[in-house]
A protein has these predicted regions:
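N-terminal alpha-helical modules
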Residues: 22-281
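N-terminal signal peptide c-region/cleavage motif recognized by signal peptidases
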Residues: 14-18
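Domain-scale selection of a single, long terminal region
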Residues: 1-2, 22
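Intrinsically disordered, low-complexity segments enriched in polar/charged small residues
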Residues: 7-8, 19, 255
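Sec-dependent N-terminal signal peptides
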Residues: 4-13
Length: 281
């Protein structure tokens, strides 16, 4: 049941409509949808840009041992953005014939698996993995990858095992100590600031009371959805690794939606004027 709730929450965070969620910053009250509608109805200047957010490249995860929820399975990547490969993918699941028992499957059997670039649909680098029994996608975060929920578990009939790669793959929770927790706390402050700024800029650009209401409602749900997902991350309360990574993912998502709504003038700036050459003497 907990896995099902977490999957639903992850789906909300990753696949929300353009009117998306915002993190409620510490010390601030949850946004009032009615107030959001009033502000959206008031004519305001369109912001020139949302807060700057530089999504990480594949170097942030290549060569690092990653575990699902910081405790289960194993994922290791190699190569670059144009030739990314999965060197190791181990999934922990349940025995099909006896769901009360756990099973472990080594996907690929040690043979590197190609991960093809799928662009940046939600602001982060996305890669697609075409495994016959278990196709999935993942987004690249800082020291982690985030795989969205699947419609159904991957079935490995010969191994009598079913498993899912969905969730946050990151550093082992047991390896994150006090020093790492302090760095994570600083990263969270930056991520929350970017998220708040991107939400505000998107609200202004929407310029529609109904959409502003939807965005405000999604905002108020984000914090609880994130908590549901990160509850299963190993030692999350001691370091907050999952919390900051999902906050960064949401900030990137809002930035992508903001950019999609850019006025035509911003998307297609006029060509630069050529300087006239002085007449030759």
């Amino acid at each position: 049941m907990r896995r099902s709730l977490a999957a639903s929450a992850l789906c909300m965070i990753l696949a929300a409509p353009p009117a998306s969620a915002q993190l409620v910053l510490p010390g601030s009250a949850a946004p009032d949808p009615a107030a959001g509608a009033e502000k959206a109805a008031t004519p305001r200047k369109t912001p020139k840009a949302a807060a700057a957010y530089a999504p990480p490249g594949v170097e942030a995860v290549v060569g690092r041992p990653l575990s699902l929820n910081g405790a289960n399975g194993a994922l290791q990547l190699s190569g670059g953005a144009d030739a990314l490969k999965i060197d190791r993918l181990t999934l922990l699941g349940e025995v099909i014939s006896d769901p009360t028992r756990q099973c472990r499957i080594d996907v690929g059997g040690g043979t590197p698996i190609e991960a093809k670039s799928a662009g940046r649909p939600d602001g982060l680098l996305r890669f697609a993995v075409d495994i016959p029994a278990c196709p999935f996608e993942f987004d690249v975060l800082d020291g982690a990858v985030l795989a969205p929920p699947q419609l159904k578990a991957c079935i490995f009939e010969q191994a009598d095992c079913q498993a899912s790669p969905s969730g946050l793959w990151g550093a082992a929770g047991s390896a994150l100590g006090a020093a790492e927790a302090k760095q994570i706390e600083q990263a969270r402050a930056h991520a929350e600031a970017a998220l708040a700024a991107n939400y505000h800029a998107l609200t202004v650009r929407l310029n529609d009371p109904a959409k502003a209401n939807d965005l405000a409602r999604d905002q108020s749900r984000f914090s609880s959805d994130r908590q549901d997902i990160c509850r299963d991350y190993a030692r999350e309360s001691a370091h907050g690794f999952c919390t900051v990574r999902l906050t960064e993912a949401r900030a990137a998502f809002l930035k992508a939606r903001f950019d999609e709504l850019a006025p035509a003038a911003e998307k297609n700036p006029p060509p630069a004027r050529r300087k006239r050459k002085p007449p030759q003497q």
